[in-house]
Amino acid sequence: MRVQICAVGRLKAAPEKHLLDDYISRLDATGRGIGISALPVCEVEEKRRLQGSELMEREAELLLAAIPKGALIIALDERGRIETSEAFAKRIGTLRDSGAADLAFLIGGANGLAPALRERASHVMAFGAMTWPHMLVRVMLAEQLYRAVTILSGHPYHRA
Ligand SMILES: C[S@@+](CC[C@H](N)C(=O)[O-])C[C@H]1O[C@@H](n2cnc3c(N)ncnc32)[C@H](O)[C@@H]1O
């Protein structure tokens, strides 16, 4: 199963980018042995000056166009479900075992994800009830994906 993070906005050369690249490459290196690989992070951006719901709907279109066709979608949203790292790892392992080819994680921009996109997702996950900057959410998600593959492969990175 291939996993991909797809986000609104461009991450310039910054400490967050360094961390993100590091976790994605660790995720790919550890995940391949257990049937999970990482696609490059994809970023989308609307250049026109749209506002509010019009902007969110356009960003939703761009996100859906950027992910692999037929990918299962997990949306990142503070109104989503909070779970432990072990439960998240189990969720990823179950999807892999079910034969899912591609799994896309979608992160919104400053306005958040369009409600229709959240409804389309097979799961909506939250890193707590607080709102985090989308640049940090990418890094947090990449780390949790790396942690998940270490849990699934019995690697000692995660200590419960
Ligand atoms: C700055 S936030 C947007 C907040 C926006 N006001 C909203 O209501 O969704 C940008 C993106 O980061 C992600 N995000 C922020 N906080 C999060 C959290 N606690 N859990 C999961 N994702 C989060 C979501 O994908 C969100 O669309």
Curated annotation (Swiss-Prot):
GO cellular component: cytoplasm
Gene3D superfamilies: 3.40.1280.10
Catalytic activity: pseudouridine(1915) in 23S rRNA + S-adenosyl-L-methionine = N(3)-methylpseudouridine(1915) in 23S rRNA + S-adenosyl-L-homocysteine + H(+)
EC annotation from Swiss-Prot or TrEMBL: 2.1.1.177
Principal location class: cytoplasm
Subcellular location: Cytoplasm
Gene Ontology MF terms in the entry: rRNA (pseudouridine-N3-)-methyltransferase activity
Transmembrane segments: none
Family: Belongs to the RNA methyltransferase RlmH family.
Official protein name in the record: Ribosomal RNA large subunit methyltransferase H
UniProt source species: Parvibaculum lavamentivorans (strain DS-1 / DSM 13023 / NCIMB 13966)
Gene name tied to this protein: rlmH
